[in-house]
Amino acid sequence: EAQLLLQRTPVDDPLDDAAAQALADELTALAPSAVVTGLPLGKYIGCAGSGSDRFVVKKLHIDRSFPGTGDLYGAVLIGSLIQGNALSAAADNAAEFVSLAIQNTPAEQDTRFGVWFEPLLPRLCPPRDF
């Protein structure tokens, strides 16, 4: 999608960290900050962000695909930003949560039903003193 926004032909070739960062940097011509997700980084899958907070986040690629993980990533990212985290920390939190949700989903689970993230929801709520 990022390559389409930049009017390029989409490619699935693996990127290195510098190319991932450059892709995010180029998107700041269209918006003040940007996060590009689903980047193939060799044995990792990652995201890169640009704007006032530049970063590359990598997680070990898990060879399973589920619908809804992009929506889950976005929800955790926004929630983490609302909690006051920097964009780089929010992106890392979201990537880690999605990775854990994929790992938490039984191998025999029909992928059409998405990942089992519900047991992990307490990880998203900071402890509070009442």
Task: State where each predicted segment sits.
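Glycine-rich beta-alpha junction loops
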Residues: 1, 38-42, 60-63, 94-98
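Conserved phosphate/ATP/ADP-binding segment of small-molecule kinases
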Residues: 1-54, 88
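Phosphate-handling active-site elements
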Residues: 55-56, 80-94
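Short, small-residue alpha-helix embedded
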Residues: 64-87
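Charged C-terminal helix
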Residues: 88-130
